[in-house]
Amino acid sequence: MARKLSVILILTFALSVTNPLHELKAAAFPQTTEKISPNWESGINVDLAITTRQYHLQQLFYRYGENNSLSVEGFRKLLQNIGIDKIKRIHIHHDHEHHSDHEHHSDHEHHSDHEHHSHRNHAASGKNKRKALCPDHDSDSSGKDPRNSQGKGAHRSEHASGRRNVKDSVSASEVTSTVYNTVSEGTHFLETIETPRPGKLFPKDVSSSTPPSVTEKSRGSRLAGRKTNESVSEPRKGFMYSRNTNENPQECFNASKLLTSHGMGIQVPLNATEFNYLCPAIINQIDARSCLIHTSEKKAEIPPKTYSLQIAWVGGFIAISIISFLSLLGVILVPLMNRVFFKFLLSFLVALAVGTLSGDAFLHLLPHSHASHHHSHSHEEPAMEMKRGPLFSHLSSQNIEESAYFDSTWKGLTALGGLYFMFLVEHVLTLIKQFKDKKKKNQKKPENDDDVEIKKQLSKYESQLSTNEEKVDTDDRTEGYLRADSQEPSHFDSQQPAILEEEEVMIAHAHPQEVYNEYVPRGCKNKCHSHFHDTLGQSDDLIHHHHDYHHILHHHHHQNHHPHSHSQRYSREELKDAGIATLAWMVIMGDGLHNFSDGLAIGAAFTEGLSSGLSTSVAVFCHELPHELGDFAVLLKAGMTVKQAVLYNALSAMLAYLGMATGIFIGHYAENVSMWIFALTAGLFMYVALVDMVPEMLHNDASDHGCSRWGYFFLQNAGMLLGFGIMLLISIFEHKIVFRINF
């Protein structure tokens, strides 16, 4: 009996010695510092799980680290590749949204959290969810393994290995809250992700602002502090979760925030053990979609709206003010309207307006009106997305957004290329035809001079013959007949100079240099830019070819029936007969409505972002410059003083401010209405550019003014290409244009 008792005591002593040695051996393993479970637990091969985790860590460090350490830059690249480096805005269709999410989680065997095809179950199954993320919370107070709520498989072994190592991350600053709220659409969003304030969940000697050095002793001390806090924390919420710590309902942790939230310095390279502490937070961000914003959620849209609203008011007011001051610029440029330099300037400005208007329509407004290039994923292959799950969307969201955006930009640029190609073809053909016509006229001119000389000689010869006949038949004619016959040649001779003078005038009209010198200044003064045509009489063939800057000053071709000096006086009388009051109301209402539409477009564009408002403002500025100059010239022609003209232009500009305010309110408070405003504005811009301005660029008579047609051609091409280039640069780099306003 005594022998049996001694054997039992020896075995008991041996077991008591073996267990501490086994725990010390497990603690020496680089990935675990505490062994709380046997090698086989609930059918899980713990050693295999640890080995597999070590393999995956080695793969990550091989790709992103150097010398068995991971730098902050490498960590940022890792976050970028898995798609959680910054906030992205996506749109998920409700028909397959829940099924896709459910299938993704079912692939990972999270059956306990997704049983009803809805993310509302996150709130109901929060206990299981938190146990999966923090499996060691009840390990000291309960003998039950919290992993039992999960499914079976290899994924569960990863949770088992993570369970033992979460205890090592004793810094209570590893706070990445995943509190979900139920929304009407059936989707969930991250409510709070914030490092808690020191003193609430942290030990008194631990602060997130000054993370301590990561050593084994400090980890042990923080472990004791964590267990102390764990004993007083709520069992349902867990020590790692905090509510109402941030006013912002969404936060995407970047590399620096993840490191500081875990009590790690951003300048210290990470080893495998330290990186192991960050893995639950990284997986948590992917699972919580904290770096994604669903456009179907109204709450998710609030932060960007608040930011863009400030930009919209400030940027829109500045843009409208600058454009409205163009009317004052007309006061300076009116004295220059009779000079050749002004013609070249207007030609360049009109071409620039065509380039910016069409470029803004094709490269910015139309792509933004579809709202697909930076707001959503592609829905062309929903079946593939459901099969691969939302994780596939997370990994490829950035590439999809950039490729889709630039795809729309290149397609718009291709459309502009087709427009520019047809402009070149028609313009070159017109120049060739005009060159041939001029050559023919130069060939016909000597022939007409020869005809005049021949007619002069014939008239002299006929007069001599008639005189000789008079002398021969003098005796046979009566006195009255002789008087009548003698008057015939004199009458013929008297009529001949009139005929010759008329022919000379006709020939001179073919190249009326002096007349044109008188007509051109009047024509430039009498035409003004507007978007409607008058019904006054049209000019003859000479005036038909004289479409000087019809795109700028084109609705007052007032009675240009012949290029004489009195036509200027007649046109001025017509303007005065219309009445100053009538013309003023026409400018205020017509230009006011036009300015209102411009302000509406600018306001809606600024609610979309700074780059969007900038591109639209540039386009409006370029086409309003010749517009305002033309309106100012017409008001002065009607007999107004400079002060009155400035006043009426200012009144019409006030409607632009009203349009801007309307566009901001619509774009900010009405969902998706700004996209329709973009589409409408694109149509207006295309009409003004292609219908009003391009035809007059093609049908100018620069050579009749002593100017080179090819000079105008190259100047117009330079203006159009410059406008295209400005809009293209804004379109490509608009996501990098950032301007913050802090009040």
Curated annotation (Swiss-Prot):
The chain crosses the membrane at residues 314-334, 344-364, 412-432, 646-666, 675-695, 713-733. One of its GO terms (cellular component) is apical plasma membrane. Residues 96-116, 133-147, 155-167, 227-237 have a biased composition (Basic and acidic residues). Residues 21-313, 365-411, 667-674, 734-743 are extracellular. It comes from Pongo abelii. This is Zinc transporter ZIP6. Cleaved on the N-terminus before locating to the plasma membrane. Glycans are attached at residues 67, 229, 254, 271, 672.
